[in-house]
Design a protein with these regions (language model features):
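Flexible, glycine-/basic-rich loop-and-beta segments that form/coincide
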Residues: 406-504
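Conserved S-adenosyl-L-methionine
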Residues: 179, 183-303, 308-319, 343, ...
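Short acidic (Asp/Glu) and glycine-rich catalytic loops that position anionic groups and cofactors
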Residues: 144, 240-243, 276-283, 323-329, ...
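Short, contiguous acidic/charged loop-to-helix segments that flank catalytic cores in large enzymes
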Residues: 30, 312-340, 370-380, 401-407, ...
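Conserved Class I SAM-dependent methyltransferase catalytic core
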Residues: 20, 32, 36, 40-48, ...
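Non-catalytic, mostly N-terminal accessory regions of nucleic-acid modification and defense proteins
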Residues: 9, 13-202, 269, 276-287, ...
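Short, exposed "boundary/linker" segments that immediately precede the start
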Residues: 1-7
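Short, well-ordered loop/turn and helix-capping segments at boundaries between secondary-structure elements
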Residues: 45, 51, 55, 267, ...
């Protein structure tokens, strides 16, 4: 977990979490264990909002009383009174609800929040929760408990609240939120992604004091990426007279986590526009099938979409957009397999980058390894990579250490997208192998490692240098591409008329459709050639001759292409030394059993490759000229894959046989000595 100077670690949040979960003892027996989180979380958020409003409570109530009968819209007046974009006009608070009419008073208290704050509790179905607590006789006690803890942002920062929430999720897992693992991005990963995204624009921020830029996270969860990015630029005040301003936007699928993010944004203000309600830009819904920011673009994007999650629930809308809008929509390049929608978010972010003429856009997205290489040439995954690379949108990919996520130990990768690359990065992708940049921490779920401040700084410096080194490669994007060619070889086959062939003929559908009388005519003709070996082209003249002979005898039989194919299937025997089979036009017939494929680097001519790599071993091989790419119409289908091992592989020579032999003899001696001791006892 990131532990910057302005941030408490997750462990520092434990005293608060211990207090909150002491409330579970008051719930035990009346509520299921699985309900605890859904009860406690909204109370946590309520108390946090209450702590912020407490200093101006009397001023707001007095102002509301003075203006409510005037008929004017007093919303702006009350916001100015609180110095925040929300307010509450009730005289109640958690500490003065009373023990006799607690439920009615609490419901009245919630109802007097401004609309943008009240929606938070609606998403938790808080009204029903209050009724259940009241019936169980514990509502007053829970309210009193929370009234005694200070959750003001000056006491408990946004990061600690986010860490706290995620700690509680890990403690109760899916019982609190079935999609919990989808949004829990460790703070160290968030901070690294933010630094890589924003630091390249230092010069822009320095030359434009107070520059306003938009920020977007399509999978915003509790808002960790958004708040961290905003805090990151706020720290620029140490260097710049007026730091830049990021205006956050986000979308979240899960109502509960959306509510947490709403709370976080309600409590944040922009120095340039203190009354602005940042929570209005945090939307609820599925980003893939219900984009709440359609046709909008952003200067900066951050995202950690779920790993390996099916997108079948969104498939109808996504497929329709792909087919109807094509490249005018988000998913024009292609669609991945249904079992992993992470590449759809990659395309979604690319579509959200601000246009270069408006300052351009940059994005950072955390993905598993699958989007690097899943899918062969012409597959949806490969076509997505192709579009991103050929349009020069991929600036860098960072391989992160394993075991840095809470719910998985798999390898993860941080992609940096940009449509405003500087000259040294054009047409190139920087690969950074940061798998060794970590320090050990106390286990938190599957998380055993962290990218600390020093390691983060090293990675950012490596990225900024944009040079080749032991852990960095600047790669021409075409090096990731290949052209998959279909390699054919001639069919070399003789026709051997024997009992084995006759038995196989019985299984051919064309034979089975014949009448018994016609079958007998063909059998009589074939038996005249029993034991003979013929060229492959013999079948057609034989059939024609048999048809004529039957006709002369007053019998009408037919021998079309299907029947001749049945004869060659039944009696054909491959003959490596035979002549290639030719079709009616004199063209070589390919042997389907010898068909093979070769992936030829895009930077190489396919015929040169064939001559060097294939023909020395298979002199009769040739390229199928009809196997073409759908887009460029050239022979061979284009594919792209990004294989880190190819660029960072280190050869480790095997140990010398003498060393291995000596070690084995030593072990044998030790075993013999142990056995001798046992024998003497």
């Amino acid at each position: 977990i990131y532990t910057g100077e302005d941030t408490l670690s997750l462990h520092d949040a434990l005293p608060i979490s211990d207090f909150i979960w002491k409330n579970a003892e008051d719930l035990w027996g009346d509520f299921k264990h699985t309900d605890f989180g859904k009860i406690i979380l909204p109370f946590t958020l309520l108390r946090r909002l209450e702590c912020v409003l407490e200093p101006t409570r009397k001023e707001v109530c007095d102002s509301h009383a003075a203006h409510k009968a005037s008929g004017i819209d007093i919303d702006l007046i009350l916001r100015q009174a609180t110095r925040y974009p929300f307010y509450n006009t009730s005289e109640y608070a958690l500490g003065n609800l009373g023990s006799t009419k607690t439920r009615q008073n609490l419901q009245d208290y919630i109802a007097h929040f401004s609309d943008n704050a009240r929606i938070i509790f609606e998403q938790f179905d808080f009204s029903n929760t209050v009724i259940r607590l009241d019936k169980a006789g514990v509502l007053f006690k829970i309210c009193k408990n929370f009234a005694g803890v200070d959750l003001h942002p000056e006491v408990v920062s946004d990061r600690v609240m986010s860490n706290l929430y995620e700690h509680l999720i890990r403690r109760f897992g899916a019982e609190v939120n079935e999609g919990a693992e989808d949004f829990m991005t460790p703070r160290d990963v968030v901070h690294l992604a933010t630094a890589l995204l924003l630091d390249p624009d230092d010069a822009l921020f320095e030359s434009n004091p107070g520059l306003i830029r938009t920020l977007y996270d399509p999978t915003c969860g509790t808002g960790g990426f958004l708040t961290d990015a905003m805090n990151h630029v706020a720290e620029y005040s140490n260097r710049f007279k007026v730091p830049p301003v990021l205006v956050p936007h986000g979308q979240e699928l899960e109502p509960e986590t959306h509510a947490v993010c709403l709370t976080s944004m309600l409590l944040r203000t922009l120095e340039s526009d203190p009354g602005r309600d940042l929570s209005k830009n945090i939307r609820l819904g599925s980003t893939l099938s219900n984009d709440q920011f359609a046709n909008e673009r952003f200067h900066y994007c951050l995202s950690n979409p779920p790993f390996g999650k099916k997108w079948e629930k969104d498939s109808d809308v996504v497929n329709t957009e792909h087919k109807e809008k094509k490249y005018d929509g988000r998913f024009g390049p292609g669609l991945p397999r249904i079992n992993d929608g992470s590449m759809l978010f990659l395309l979604h972010l690319a579509s959200k980058l601000e246009l270069p003429e408006n300052g351009g856009g940059r994005a950072a997205i955390v993905l598993s390894g699958s989007p690097l290489f899943n899918g062969g040439a012409s597959s949806g995954e490969s076509e997505i990579r192709r579009w991103l690379l050929e349009n020069d949108l991929v600036e860098a990919i960072v391989a992160l250490p394993t075991e840095i996520f809470f719910r998985t130990g798999i390898g993860t990768y941080l992609w940096i997208l940009s449509n405003k690359k500087d000259g040294r990065r054009e047409k190139r992708v920087q690969l950074i192998n940061a798998t060794g940049f970590w320090s050990s921490i106390k286990n938190e779920g599957n998380k055993r490692r962290s990218v600390d401040d020093d390691h983060r700084s090293q990675i950012v410096d490596i990225y900024a240098a944009a040079e080749n080194s032991e852990v960095s490669r600047m790669i021409d994007y075409r090096s990731f591409g290949y052209r998959r060619i279909k390699v054919l070889r001639p069919l070399r086959m003789s026709l051997v008329i024997d009992d084995k062939g006759l038995a196989k003929l019985q299984d051919e559908k064309a034979w089975q459709k014949l009448s018994a009388e016609h079958q007998q005519i063909w059998l009589d003709a074939l038996r005249q050639h029993m034991g003979n070996t013929h060229l492959f082209g013999w079948a057609e003249p034989f059939a024609d001759e048999t048809v004529r002979s039957a006709l002369a005898a007053g019998k009408v039989i037919k021998a079309g292409k299907t029947f001749i194919k049945a004869l060659t299937n039944a009696f054909g025997v491959r003959d490596p030394l035979g002549e290639p089979v030719l079709d009616a036009d004199g063209a070589v017939v390919a042997d389907p059993e010898l068909t093979d494929y070769e992936n030829v680097p895009l930077t190489e001519d396919i015929r040169d490759y064939l001559a060097r790599e294939v023909l020395p071993h298979l002199p009769d091989a040739y390229i199928d000229e009809s196997f073409c790419d759908e887009k460029d119409k050239k022979v061979g289908r284009v594919g792209y894959e990004i294989n880190f091992n190819r660029f960072f592989y280190k050869y480790v020579p095997p140990r010398k046989l003498n060393d291995i032999d000596a070690e084995l003899k030593q072990v044998e001696s030790e075993i013999a000595a142990l056995l001798a001791e046992v024998a003497t006892e």
